[in-house]
Amino acid sequence: MDGLRKLAVAAIAVLAVPPLFSQPGVVGTDSGKLQGVTQGSVESFKGVPFAAPPVGELRWRAPQPVQQWSDVRAANAYSADCMQVPFPSDAAPLGTKPAEDCLYLNVWRPAGTNADAKLPVMFWIYGGGFVNGGSSPAVYDGSKFAEKGVVLVSANYRLGRFGFFAFPELTKENADGMVGNYGFMDQIAALKWVQKNISAFGGDPANVTVFGESAGGFSVSMLLTSPLSQGLFSKAIIESGGGRTNLGGQRYLNTALPNGPASAESVGIEFARSVGVDATGKDALDKLRHLSAEQVLGNLNMATMNQPGYAGPFIDGRVVLSDPQSVYLSGAGWHVPLMIGTNSMDIGFGFARDKEELFAPFGNDREKAIAAYDPTGKGELRTVQYQVSMDRFMVEPARFVASIFASEGLPAYEYRFSYVAKSMRSKWPGAPHATEIPFVFDTVQAKYGSELAPEDEKIAQAMLNYWVSFARTGDPSTANTPAWPRYSTATDMLMDFTENGPVAEKDPLKARLDVTAAYVTSSAPAPAPKLPARP
């Protein structure tokens, strides 16, 4: 009882102290003036529209301009996240109720920043398999970046069938090729907003770093390889975002490869049939646009991603030229400094019935694969299969992308996040997918609450400093952190975030990744033809 009384008194004391909020100066954008909120040393502007609401006749269209407003607009709360079926075990639970009207962004900056400050800008892209996610989760709060002198921007983008949908009539309606990958178009539109407006917030439009995790990392790969993102950013960070393939496989707009997934248009036609719309009817598209948001949404979320009707990115030839690997190898894409990495217990999956089936695809390198992944022959199938699939899907592709950038003389830095929060060490043998995010944002208090340990905070502060330094200079190393060596194939060095702190080391998974690289290279699709040259 005594402990409960102390908690009650503490709670009353907290409630009795007014929050340190005040009204900052008004900021003007190309659409109108904004009034944000100051909390301590940080000013935030939330729920800022960067495109017209994509509803009604604007459903399944490229983002359109915002209607200007004349009064000062209050920018004091997150807008709705984009339409989705929330995922119960999401590592970043939403802070708002999803809605179709969702194309809004958020800005954090140091309080009192002048318009001519030219601070580095960081643009965050959330993950969620392109069917979940949003900018409102507490772990994505940009305040700690602002405290370090960064202007941080996060933006919503359309998800699921709202963000990634193809249909024959849509293709005919958009002769310019801006069809299907609306979620990516939203990201590009938000980055264009940054170029036009961020200087009013004290940010430098010539120093923008895009960074994202999982689907957000795949999105950064898209931005690095899309001709439509030219000049919109100057650095990139990919967290657990693959790098060789598109999420969802080698799906095309209206064709399908042998043994590949159905075309995006075929998926759209099947969806129309499922809601009683004749895909060949003259009014089919009109009927689809008049469906309720709930009808379009269906049951898509991260738990149903393996269903045939998954609505994710596809190759359209305009926004998405090809799979990232083909674009990188063809010499197309954008020359920028890069940070890239994965977690020590990142995404892995597989369906092999035994080890014979698991290692058979390695062909002539089968014995090398066994030596790398199961040297004693006593490893559990589930564990070995997980490591093989994790390396194939996440870890080796990250090294591949780092090697491509390094070979072109670009600064490339690879990391591995092995740190496990102290309160989770009895449950997790390694760092699962997405667990680095609260450490990058230094929002570990929001994530772990009373279970937060001092060593957790120390790693969070180190990671935040590395990310900020990279955004500021293109080099993550700082005077107060261990030096982070540039990646090269000759040294294979990376920065591992461990329970002992950041450790620069030669990649201990090199043998595994070498044999996996040989396999994925031999089984990769042919490079796409006629890709534009990298400028």
What does each model-found stretch correspond to?
Residues 21-181, 446, 450-463, 472-483, ...:
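Non-catalytic accessory segments of hydrolases
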Residues 235, 247-248, 253, 283-455, ...:
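Substrate-gating cap/lid region and adjacent catalytic-acid/histidine neighborhood
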Residues 158-161, 211-215, 416-423, 482-488:
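Short, solvent-exposed turn/loop segments enriched in Gly/Ser/Thr/Pro and often Arg
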